Amino acid sequence: GKPILIKDNVETKDDLPTTGGSWALINNKNNRDSPIVKKLRDSGAVILGKTNLSQWANFRSESSTSGWSAVRGQVKNPHVLNRSPCGSSSGSGSAVASGIVAAAIGTETNGSIICPSTMNGIVGFKPTVGLLSQEHIIPISSTQDTAGPMTLTVKGSAIMMDAMTENDGSYVDNLSKTIPQSTTIGILSFARGGNIGVNKNFNKAIEELKAKGFNFVEIESWDPGEGFFEAAYKVLKYEFKSTLNNYLSTTNTKVEVRSLKDLIEFNKKDERELKIFDQSIFLSSEKLDDLNSEDYKKSLKLILNATRENGIDKLMEQYNLDFLMAPSAAPTFLIDHMYGDSYPGGTGAGWIPAIAGYPHITVPMGTYKNLPTGLSFMGRSGQDKEVIAMGYAYEQASGSLRKRPSYLPSIETVTSGYILEE
């Protein structure tokens, strides 16, 4: 069997607690595999252990530090050790990049598979929401959460998807089918961002794909509409309170926190929990009503309409596209326990398929100053096999640009034996 690692918000039947990175769940052993873990075991996978994560999948504080949890401390980025591994599937990304395993499970609500995969220089795939069961996984959102594979190669992600969907090799088989020469890809130019290295690598990727016969259309701008980001954040806070309370009610009696309210009180009393950042998101989520609220329904309708009918679906129809493409993210930032993440915005469009619930893959796109960059392909709902196959086509065209980690203490390190590239 192939050894794999599982993010510490996904339940496994063995003697490992599922903590979400919090001491409040240190006794969360429920003697059950989440359905995706059961399917992986049935296909011969060996669960090697759990990976650290951004605590509560990075949904506790607006000033959080990615890759830090009270239970396991700080995950490092193996390429440059004082740089963020991103999150929230931080440990899964770092472990795969380090070669501890060839595959791990991550989860994503908005960016939590794609960002750590990009910043650790590996492949990450976020499936269409609902394709994989979310049962027995600590939740944030009923409309955006999904588990997904984080792997060294695109084929690795296809193998994992075959196992988790019981698709009998159809994801892997689909890789060998030639993508038609008529394939047209929409370049989300508004998501290029300003990083020189990312843009250089992105332009090279376009040329490599053009050489293989792919056609491109530039999409200069797209606007999700007024009030979008406020509504998107609000939806998550509504859903978090509801889904977390439901989840906690299914845990064993040794888990003393039975609600978000209990959790807030636990954190106030346990100095290990709040020593680096606060629980501002918990507090504002607790104040909200349940999912029958008109405010919630209106906000959800707004964001789904923006990202689906007026977003990915509209763009693909309007320009007659097969896929959308953009850089995945800017290169990673410094780990900072004083001020939290300083994520460089402007690069990447992963929030669009995340909120829409549509498939998205990131594939290594080379490095800039020893830091990995990634290329994203996105598609319509249910286009999972095709999106993975497109990622594979790029991986083959580029000759696989995954770089082994160099474990540099910092980018600024200039010592004999360290070669700092441009």
Regions found by a protein language model. Give the residues of each.
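Short helix-loop capping/hinge segments that flank enzyme active sites or metal/cofactor-binding pockets
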Residues: G1-G20, S182-L188, Y238-T307, T362-P372, ...
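Glycine/threonine-rich flexible loop motifs
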Residues: T18-I26, N195-I196, F333-S342
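Glycine-rich, small-residue loops and helix-cap segments
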Residues: K7, D42, M164, L283-E422
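Short, well-ordered beta-strand elements within core beta-sheets of diverse protein domains
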Residues: L5, A24-N28, D145-L152, M378
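Structural recognition of the beta-strand scaffold that forms the well-ordered cores
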Residues: P3-I6, K39, V46-K50, A102-G106, ...
